[in-house]
Amino acid sequence: MRVPYSWLCEVVTVGAPDWDVSASDLKQTLVRIGHEIEEMITVGPVDGPLTVGRVTDIEELTGFKKPIRACVVDVGDGQQHEIICGATNFVVGDLVVVAFPGTTLPDGFAIAACETYGRHSAGMICSAAELRLSTDHSGILVLPPGTALPGADGADVLGLDDVVFRLAITPDRGYCMSVRGLAREIACAYDLAFVDPASDQAVPPLPVGGQAWPVTVQPETGVRRCALRPVTGIDFAAVSPWWLQRRLLLSGIRAISPAVDVTNYVMLELGHPLHAHDRNRITGGFTVRFARPGETIVTIDGIERQLDPVDVLIVDNVTTAAIGGVMGAASTEVRSDSTDVLLEAAVWDPARVSHTQRRLHLPSEAARRYERAVDPAISVAALDRCAMLLADIAGGTVSETLTDWRGSPPRADWSLPPIRIAVDLPDRIAGVVYNQGATTKRLTQIGAVVVDTVSSEGHTLTVTPPSWRPDLLQPSDLVEEVLRLEGLEVIRSVRPLAPAGRGLTAVQKRYRAIGKVLAQSGYVEILPTPFLPADVFDLWGLPADDPRRTTTRVLNPLESNRPQLATTLLPALLEALVSNVSRGIIDVALFAIAQVVEPTEWTGGIGSIPVDRRLTDAEIALLDASLPRQPQHVAAVLAGLREPRGPWGPGRLAEASDAFEAVRIIARVSGVDVFFRAVQYLPWHPGRCAEVFVGETPIGHAGQLHPAVIERAGLPKGICAIELDLAAMPIVEGLPAPQVSPFPAVLQDVSLVVSTQVPAQEVQDAIRDGAGELLEDIQLFDVFTGSQIGEDCKSLTFALRFRAPDRTLTEDDASAARDAAVRHAAERVGATLRT
């Protein structure tokens, strides 16, 4: 938002005539009370002669690629000065501003007489942008008739001794998007009396005699107030005076016509947007309603726009007059032949205005104010101020009729709910002892009504926020206002004492250990996005009842196509994999450790959460019940070569066994034993996927991904992945050091023939269970299929290591344990000993 320093000073000094502060000091004060000033722009200065002139003749020069005009300008010295100019937005008789040779413009450009386009040019006709009055480069600056006489000092006429502040107004401080709001802030900061420019003192109420225009409002539209007043008999050919045009230019708005200019001016002054309709183009009364499916509107920029049923419209009996709070329609736009206007001041729903203007890509100064909330108490004052300005500038008569729709039933006042606050709460929160009465003083300054109460419960204040401060909802908001206006610099910076170190928790230790061991195994960690692409589960082909489809939707997502919080880490890992592969990095191993969000069945509502006291146990339990479950997962993906090619061989592609090994190293560092069971679970390959168990508790899945899923993702074949729920894995603290037997081991091999449908893991588990405690380790080292084995069969060869903790094993001891393992495998999985 841009606002001139001179305009702020004018409004502030109404209540404090002796107040005088420089622009730089005012900037520091605004920053001190919490406003972000992005830039302080100096208007001008111009060094050298800058003169008002009147154009007396224009000759169009031909033979050039762009319009060139030889202009004769009278500057009151009795001479005719020829100046070459490329702008075409002025005519003979217009007042312009001329810079003569020897003048240096604000950007450092020096004016000199020169020969150009075959003619002599004795200076330059200036644009508003060249004088830093605005950023509009579309043409030269044309002054309204009667602004000054030719020969007048241009710097004095234009007011080139001003400063413009460019502020970034936060969403909760919509009241500051006006001179009214900022002037009040300045008065608070300097402890000045303040006269509200929207008060009856500043805007005397106009007479009211009857309804101006019938209006019907659908209650669901969220409109809080709608005021209408006609102004008849205006002269559309009139031009807004320079003082008004100047303030619009400095605020970043181009002057268009009196009807449009005064609505923009009052919006900047009071913060309440208005709209001017051509009354003679309105048929019947106004209705405020939602758009109908398929409905369109041609807005004042001449573009036909497709509406949505959530858009709010103003319509008459025939056509649409405006998109509420966003833009007017061409059908009721004021034009060059308009004589009667109907001024409208409405208070639209902030959320609906924000949604509509973003969807239609129609950002506007009005919409920026509506989406931050507009003061409904000043709608009629803004309307009357606008009507009187329009009548003064363009003639005409302000009608005594007024429509003021205030809701159904009509609302008598616009006060906000009162807030109770302990008088010393700001002191306790800031750790500062403020002067007695500081809290009451500061809250009164911002416009609140404060009632002081002393009772058995203590000294409290009942604070009713003003109608323009809907952001004040709870005691902490009031505390912020007191601290802000008293000065944050008085709050001491005290370094908090760190508690004695207690070390990492068991969960944190496991987190670090897993990350470390995966990194040592060649995996690279990424930070996964917490949001899911909307169509990812459809691409995976998950059934409709899959739990992973039950997601938590974010109301205001960072990206519209990612509205859901992730229930799995795999989509983010696969996206990272795609990004790497698309850049030619095809041998990749990635992992992530992060939380996923699993919604609960909670359907209750949560009210406002107090921040000025400790929550009760019941409130904490309610919050806990409403929160979705957020377990920590670890996931990894592998693509390309797991073992690189080189002089030693061609390398080895990643396969399902690498995924299983990743699970084992995670289990090993976590101090748990895992086993695998074959399962069908998308997005994994149905024949190359295993469910991972700790005891009888499933903790995740591992294996090779489904070829169709890989193809849809644009990845090469053979991608492997794991995902484990660490919250389901028991925490093992203080892992004991493994006992090392001093006795030698006995090594034996065993080959078993089983059906090809039997997973090797089940055979291995059967051998381990059957061999007993003497079996120290088992490794599968060979898989063989062929006619010698039999159809639909495979041979699995395991290396067995036997060792006793208290004696030296004999070959007979080891053979007996091996035979027991073979018998157990035969009973459990139908294995036979290969001979």
From Swiss-Prot:
<dbReference type="InterPro" id="IPR005147">
    <property type="entry name" value="tRNA_synthase_B5-dom"/>
</dbReference>
<feature type="domain" description="B5">
    <location>
        <begin position="414"/>
        <end position="493"/>
    </location>
</feature>
<keyword id="KW-0648">Protein biosynthesis</keyword>
<dbReference type="InterPro" id="IPR005146">
    <property type="entry name" value="B3/B4_tRNA-bd"/>
</dbReference>
<dbReference type="InterPro" id="IPR036690">
    <property type="entry name" value="Fdx_antiC-bd_sf"/>
</dbReference>
<keyword id="KW-0547">Nucleotide-binding</keyword>
<dbReference type="GO" id="GO:0000049">
    <property type="term" value="F:tRNA binding"/>
</dbReference>
<comment type="similarity">
    <text>Belongs to the phenylalanyl-tRNA synthetase beta subunit family. Type 1 subfamily.</text>
</comment>
<dbReference type="InterPro" id="IPR033714">
    <property type="entry name" value="tRNA_bind_bactPheRS"/>
</dbReference>
<feature type="binding site">
    <location>
        <position position="481"/>
    </location>
    <ligand>
        <name>Mg(2+)</name>
    </ligand>
</feature>
<keyword id="KW-0460">Magnesium</keyword>
<dbReference type="GO" id="GO:0000287">
    <property type="term" value="F:magnesium ion binding"/>
</dbReference>
<dbReference type="InterPro" id="IPR045060">
    <property type="entry name" value="Phe-tRNA-ligase_IIc_bsu"/>
</dbReference>
<feature type="binding site">
    <location>
        <position position="477"/>
    </location>
    <ligand>
        <name>Mg(2+)</name>
    </ligand>
</feature>
<feature type="binding site">
    <location>
        <position position="480"/>
    </location>
    <ligand>
        <name>Mg(2+)</name>
    </ligand>
</feature>
<keyword id="KW-0479">Metal-binding</keyword>
<feature type="binding site">
    <location>
        <position position="471"/>
    </location>
    <ligand>
        <name>Mg(2+)</name>
    </ligand>
</feature>
<dbReference type="InterPro" id="IPR045864">
    <property type="entry name" value="aa-tRNA-synth_II/BPL/LPL"/>
</dbReference>
<dbReference type="GO" id="GO:0005524">
    <property type="term" value="F:ATP binding"/>
</dbReference>
<dbReference type="Pfam" id="PF17759">
    <property type="entry name" value="tRNA_synthFbeta"/>
</dbReference>
<dbReference type="InterPro" id="IPR012340">
    <property type="entry name" value="NA-bd_OB-fold"/>
</dbReference>
<dbReference type="InterPro" id="IPR004532">
    <property type="entry name" value="Phe-tRNA-ligase_IIc_bsu_bact"/>
</dbReference>
<keyword id="KW-0067">ATP-binding</keyword>
<dbReference type="InterPro" id="IPR020825">
    <property type="entry name" value="Phe-tRNA_synthase-like_B3/B4"/>
</dbReference>
<comment type="subunit">
    <text>Tetramer of two alpha and two beta subunits.</text>
</comment>
<dbReference type="Pfam" id="PF03147">
    <property type="entry name" value="FDX-ACB"/>
</dbReference>
<dbReference type="GO" id="GO:0006432">
    <property type="term" value="P:phenylalanyl-tRNA aminoacylation"/>
</dbReference>
<dbReference type="Pfam" id="PF03484">
    <property type="entry name" value="B5"/>
</dbReference>
<protein>
    <recommendedName>
        <fullName>Phenylalanine--tRNA ligase beta subunit</fullName>
        <ecNumber>6.1.1.20</ecNumber>
    </recommendedName>
</protein>
<keyword id="KW-0963">Cytoplasm</keyword>
<feature type="domain" description="tRNA-binding">
    <location>
        <begin position="44"/>
        <end position="158"/>
    </location>
</feature>
<feature type="domain" description="FDX-ACB">
    <location>
        <begin position="741"/>
        <end position="834"/>
    </location>
</feature>
<keyword id="KW-0820">tRNA-binding</keyword>
<dbReference type="InterPro" id="IPR009061">
    <property type="entry name" value="DNA-bd_dom_put_sf"/>
</dbReference>
<dbReference type="GO" id="GO:0004826">
    <property type="term" value="F:phenylalanine-tRNA ligase activity"/>
</dbReference>
<dbReference type="InterPro" id="IPR041616">
    <property type="entry name" value="PheRS_beta_core"/>
</dbReference>
<keyword id="KW-0694">RNA-binding</keyword>
<dbReference type="Pfam" id="PF03483">
    <property type="entry name" value="B3_4"/>
</dbReference>
<keyword id="KW-0030">Aminoacyl-tRNA synthetase</keyword>
<dbReference type="GO" id="GO:0009328">
    <property type="term" value="C:phenylalanine-tRNA ligase complex"/>
</dbReference>
<dbReference type="InterPro" id="IPR002547">
    <property type="entry name" value="tRNA-bd_dom"/>
</dbReference>
<dbReference type="Pfam" id="PF01588">
    <property type="entry name" value="tRNA_bind"/>
</dbReference>
